[in-house]
């Protein structure tokens, strides 16, 4: 059976945790930042976890994670 290819874009975006979840970076922090409050930007800097409903899709993209 051939190897399954890892989706490279997903490999750069998600990191697997020891408990089996996936860490991800928050969006909305690339441009148009002047209208966003400092508090909002500060909270967006922190990592977040992938939701349970989306975890199946991430696992399919990262077969060896």
Swiss-Prot record:
PROSITE patterns: RIBOSOMAL_L35 (PS00936). The keyword Endoplasmic reticulum does not apply. GO terms for cellular component: cytosolic large ribosomal subunit. Residues 10-26 have a biased composition (Basic residues). GO terms for biological process: translation. It holds the Pfam family Ribosomal_L35p. InterPro entries: Ribosomal_bL35, Ribosomal_bL35-like, Ribosomal_bL35_CS, Ribosomal_bL35_sf. It comes from the Bacteria. Residues 1-26 are annotated as: Disordered. One of its GO terms (molecular function) is structural constituent of ribosome. Keywords: Ribonucleoprotein, Ribosomal protein. The keyword Metal-binding does not apply. PANTHER family: 54S RIBOSOMAL PROTEIN BL35M, LARGE RIBOSOMAL SUBUNIT PROTEIN BL35M. HAMAP family: Ribosomal_bL35. Belongs to the bacterial ribosomal protein bL35 family. This is Large ribosomal subunit protein bL35.
């Amino acid at each position: 059976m051939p190897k399954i290819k890892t989706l490279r874009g997903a490999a750069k975006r998600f990191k697997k945790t020891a408990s089996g979840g996936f860490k991800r970076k928050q969006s909305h922090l690339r441009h148009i930042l002047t209208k966003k409050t400092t508090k909002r930007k500060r909270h967006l800097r922190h990592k977040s976890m992938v939701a349970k409903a989306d975890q199946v899709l991430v696992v399919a993209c990262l077969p060896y994670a």
